[in-house]
């Protein structure tokens, strides 16, 4: 058994060498034939060889047979093609199955030095798990299934986890403030069908109960720049909080690297009963334009008209605008740098409240160094402080997070990672009596998630799928 890794390496090396020799023979034969074939015939053969090689190397997106799977973000959103994938894959005769997820076991203290009265601490385990499947339909069709589950209601608690200055949703009739709400047990159950209608052109329909409408950037759990941070951004409800929507339908059109989408969906956030299915209303709308100018960039701009998103403020409708830029650069087979910049704003009850997020993750083999900066504007009502501030002023909130983690072991394509991070919050002057001038948060965690799929593994997986089909 101790020689098994060497044998596997030799087998993989031999396979790669054989494939290289085979490709070299193909190129030599093709060059020889080109000397005797007419120009058009030679060009046709070269195009066929290029298309075959491209097909062999690329696992396709769930929403296009012409795009790489690496481009798929959450819902129907895009990330850069350069984005590596952390998942397991299993191929059957006609289907490709994918498993993805993350589990944090941590201790979280939101006010280490007890500077204020709003911090909290607890042991908990934020988590989420995905199962995805897809299959080709005829010559130009593609059918896909997406599911996502979270055991947050059990491992975090129905009231969520402590997070200073976080707002959004309710529990036991009160607004959740300085806490991040738990995600629902059923976070996504959606299906999609894509039809290739012309070269580099797709039309698709995605429906979910729950699902994610075409609004905002990919949700934070599915952004490479945020995957190491267990916390939701303070700007979550300004940009990507609609990722769990009970009732959504999205129609999209893609031409090359440009995509236009529109959604109709339920504006109301999930209720405090995290194990059931909320009533679908289909009373809200959104539109999103996505552009990937190169394999390293993904850009989007979107707008949503949300009807009564918060149960605590049922008469408050929200106009949400977002814009984002995501950049990913591979530095090696297991090293990369990923950066995301997001601007989001909510316009409601006559005010426009902006939020800016900048996050980055530098992965160097087994060690990751990551950070997040946020600026968020929230009013007294959102922080549940109307009694203290009758005129409901806006407060400017800033927070900086730095963290580091290291992969301790990889067993059966699964990483065990240990990390720690700290957040420095900058309190507005009027809120210092409650929060302190600069409360410091700290957490330490163990993380379990699928290991990085390297390029050689993705090529072999796709070749196995082609052989099965």
Please name every model-derived segment.
Residues 156-290:
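Surface-exposed coil loops of outer-membrane beta-barrel proteins
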Residues 87-88, 101, 129-135, 189-195, ...:
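Residues on the lipid-exposed face of transmembrane beta-strands in outer-membrane beta-barrel proteins
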Residues 139-143, 199-203, 257-261, 295-301, ...:
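Repeated loop/turn-to-beta-strand initiation elements of outer-membrane beta-barrel proteins
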Residues 103-111, 149-155, 209-213, 255-257, ...:
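Transmembrane beta-strands of outer-membrane beta-barrel pores
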Residues 95, 120-129, 183-189, 243-249, ...:
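Residues that define the transmembrane beta-barrel architecture of outer-membrane proteins
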Residues 154-161, 168-185, 303-312, 336-357, ...:
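Outer-membrane beta-barrel translocator/channel fold
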């Amino acid at each position: 058994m101790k020689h098994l890794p060497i044998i596997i390496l030799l087998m993989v090396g031999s396979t790669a060498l054989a494939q290289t020799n085979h490709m070299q023979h193909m190129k030599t034969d093709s060059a020889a034939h080109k000397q005797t074939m007419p120009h058009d015939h030679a060009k046709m053969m070269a195009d066929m060889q290029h298309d075959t090689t491209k097909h062999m190397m690329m696992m396709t997106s769930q929403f296009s047979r012409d795009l790489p799977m690496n481009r798929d973000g959450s819902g129907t959103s895009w990330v850069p093609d350069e984005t590596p994938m952390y998942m397991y894959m299993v191929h059957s005769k006609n289907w490709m199955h994918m498993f993805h997820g993350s589990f944090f076991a941590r201790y979280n203290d939101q006010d280490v030095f007890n500077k204020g009265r709003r911090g909290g601490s607890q042991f908990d385990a934020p988590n989420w798990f995905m199962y995805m499947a897809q299959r080709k339909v005829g010559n130009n069709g593609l059918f896909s299934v997406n599911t996502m589950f979270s055991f947050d209601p059990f491992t975090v608690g129905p009231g969520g986890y402590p997070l200073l200055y976080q707002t959004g949703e309710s529990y036991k009739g009160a607004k959740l403030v300085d806490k991040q709400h738990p995600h629902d047990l059923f976070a996504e159950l959606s299906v999609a069908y894509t039809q290739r209608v012309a070269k580099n052109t797709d039309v698709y329909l995605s429906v979910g109960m729950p699902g994610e409408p075409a609004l905002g950037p990919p949700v934070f759990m599915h952004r490479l720049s945020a995957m190491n941070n267990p916390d939701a951004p303070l700007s979550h409800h300004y940009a990507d909080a609609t990722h769990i929507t009970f009732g959504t339908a999205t129609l999209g059109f893609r031409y090359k690297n440009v995509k236009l989408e529109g959604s109709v969906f339920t504006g109301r956030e999930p209720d405090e009963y995290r194990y059931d299915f909320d009533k679908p209303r289909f009373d809200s709308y959104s539109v999103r334009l996505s552009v990937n100018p190169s394999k390293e960039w993904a850009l989007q701009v979107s707008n949503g008209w949300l009807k009564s998103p918060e149960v605590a403020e049922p008469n408050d409708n929200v106009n949400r605008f977002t814009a984002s830029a995501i950049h990913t650069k591979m530095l090696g087979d297991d090293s990369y740098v990923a950066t995301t910049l997001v601007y989001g704003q909510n316009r409601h009850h006559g005010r426009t409240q902006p939020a800016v997020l900048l996050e980055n993750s530098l992965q160097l083999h087994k060690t990751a160094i990551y950070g997040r900066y946020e600026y968020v504007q929230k009013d007294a009502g959102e922080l549940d402080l109307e009694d203290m501030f009758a005129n409901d002023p806006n407060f400017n909130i800033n927070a900086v997070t730095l963290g580091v983690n290291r992969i301790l072991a990889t067993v059966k394509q699964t990483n065990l990672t240990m990390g720690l991070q700290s957040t420095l919050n900058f309190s507005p002057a009027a809120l210092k009596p409650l929060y302190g001038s600069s409360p410091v948060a700290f957490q330490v965690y163990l993380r379990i998630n699928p290991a990085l799929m390297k390029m050689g593994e993705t090529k072999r997986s796709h070749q196995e799928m082609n052989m099965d089909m």
